[in-house]
């Protein structure tokens, strides 16, 4: 990078969905962005990803609506989530009409990354693929990293600050939290994949899964004590995906790419009364796309911002979520939006302040969703689903609450910015109102650690 201009110079490390969201948000709000990804190509494995309206209202602003138009075929048309026990008996119909009042998306992860990547390039984000980043450092004036290409070239890249969006195994996190952050094994893992729709169409035993999807996509969940399967269609039945949370009997490595044998899935569900019906769909997963990865429990970190206020963690690097919440990417997109908005309101001379403001606004809310996701999973595991009656406490329902999906993070940031600035500058706590107070107490959510008043430091 050349000499620093008037724009905020943003370095992003990690270009998954959240890193791309940060790149787009920062660039569309007038900042200069250089993003790095160690892979040569942007790719994603696994199944589909859902984005609720707390994220899609952010995406709808990108490119004056152009990104939303590209994603329009993937707007969720499901009217309900149907929850069943292992015999296939319908336990609960969870209405989605309020959740889907604003557009929600459900689409293959790879398709979302493609659309976001193309838009990022179009608006002028500088993207370096196949480049590993190391040695992050900061001072009161800015931050830098060392970029290592596959050809062995070593280059120091300097900017105003660094967004660390390099995932749950973040290497950048050490620069912010020197002590290692060790997740706790949950004892569970997840199979997940896309189904080969073309072969699925030709299987008469699987014809049931296409019923009604041209009008309303399917979202079915099946429970057995100790396991859970979700089966979804999107784009009016053009794509089917599934995932299964199950006991981890292999002590899997904590990576997304642990290979799996489809027969493991068959062994798991063949004892279910509904097992053969589900297998008629799942067997159409291509073996090379069949993955199995462990689910780990992560405590909220103490903080996300570095000592000089020039590095910030976002997304899974800051607050990994269990799949139960369906909010992993959506919360990361909120991070990106709040950070970019805070930068625009603060200006280049107050970059460190902007990072602390974004952390204060997001910390309690993201921590609450993180803890809820773990608690919901634990509740599911301890329930006797075959004995479950619909009039019991509705523990089967997914956490689809208005305070989560109805939130407008940009409007909230613009409204609260000056109040948070005062709290940061005076070294006081900021009590965020973007989560319910009652829930904050129930979950034991605290505010982010209060540091030395920022006004006593250099900008």
UniProtKB/Swiss-Prot annotation:
It comes from the Eukaryota. Pathway: Alkaloid biosynthesis; Secondary metabolite biosynthesis. Keywords: FAD, Flavoprotein, Monooxygenase, Oxidoreductase. The active site is at residues 192, 232. Changing residue 241 to A: Reduces the catalytic activity toward both paraherquamides K and L. GO terms for molecular function: FAD binding; monooxygenase activity. Its EC number is 1.-.-.-. FAD binds at residues 18, 37, 47, 50, 109, 133, 316. Changing residue 219 to A: Reduces the catalytic activity toward both paraherquamides K and L. Pfam families: FAD_binding_3. InterPro entries: FAD-bd, FAD-dep_Monooxygenase_BioMet, FAD/NAD-bd_sf. Belongs to the paxM FAD-dependent monooxygenase family. This is FAD-dependent monooxygenase phqK.
């Amino acid at each position: 990078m050349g000499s620093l201009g008037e724009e905020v110079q943003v370095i992003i490390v990690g270009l998954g969905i959240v890193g791309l969201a940060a790149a787009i948000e920062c660039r569309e709000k007038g900042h200069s962005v250089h993003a790095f990804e160690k892979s040569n190509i942007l790719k994603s494995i696994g199944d589909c990803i859902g984005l609720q309206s707390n994220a899609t209202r952010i995406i709808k602003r990108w490119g004056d609506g152009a990104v939303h138009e590209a994603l329009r075929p993937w707007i969720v048309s499901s009217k309900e989530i149907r929850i069943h026990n292992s015999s296939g008996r319908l336990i609960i119909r969870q209405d989605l009409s309020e959740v889907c009042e604003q557009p929600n998306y459900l689409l293959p992860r790879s398709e979302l990354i493609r659309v976001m990547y193309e838009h990022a390039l179009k608006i002028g984000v500088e993207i370096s693929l196949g480049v590993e980043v190391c040695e992050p450092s900061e001072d009161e004036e800015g931050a830098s990293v060392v970029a290592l290409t596959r050809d062995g070239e070593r280059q120091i890249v300097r900017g105003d600050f660094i967004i660390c969006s390099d995932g749950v195994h973040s290497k950048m996190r050490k620069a912010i939290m020197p002590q290692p952050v060790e997740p706790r094994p949950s004892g569970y893992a997840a199979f997940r994949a896309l189904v080969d729709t073309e072969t699925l169409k030709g299987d008469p035993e699987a014809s049931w899964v296409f019923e009604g999807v041209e009008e309303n996509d399917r979202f079915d969940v099946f429970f057995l004590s100790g396991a859970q399967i979700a089966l979804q269609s999107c784009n009016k039945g053009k794509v089917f995906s599934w995932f299964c949370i199950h006991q981890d009997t292999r002590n899997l490595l904590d990576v997304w790419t642990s290979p799996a044998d489809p027969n493991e899935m068959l062994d798991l569900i063949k004892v279910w009364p509904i097992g053969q019906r589900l297998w008629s769909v799942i067997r159409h997963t291509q073996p090379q796309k069949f993955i199995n990865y462990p689910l780990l429990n992560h405590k909220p970190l103490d903080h996300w911002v570095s000592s000089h206020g020039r590095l910030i963690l976002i997304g899974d690097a800051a607050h990994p979520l269990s799949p139960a919440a369906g909010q992993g990417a959506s919360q990361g997109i909120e991070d990106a939006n709040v950070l970019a908005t805070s930068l625009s309101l603060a200006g280049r001379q107050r970059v460190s302040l902007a990072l602390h403001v974004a952390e204060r606004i997001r910390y309690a809310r993201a921590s609450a969703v993180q803890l809820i996701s773990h608690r919901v999973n634990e509740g599911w595991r301890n329930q006797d689903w075959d004995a479950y009656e619909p009039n019991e406490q509705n523990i089967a329902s997914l956490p689809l609450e208005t305070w989560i999906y109805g939130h407008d993070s940009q409007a909230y940031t613009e409204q609260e910015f000056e109040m948070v600035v005062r709290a940061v500058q005076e070294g006081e706590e900021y009590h965020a109102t973007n989560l319910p107070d009652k829930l904050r107490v129930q979950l034991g959510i605290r505010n982010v650690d209060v540091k030395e008043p920022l006004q006593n430091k250099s900008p």
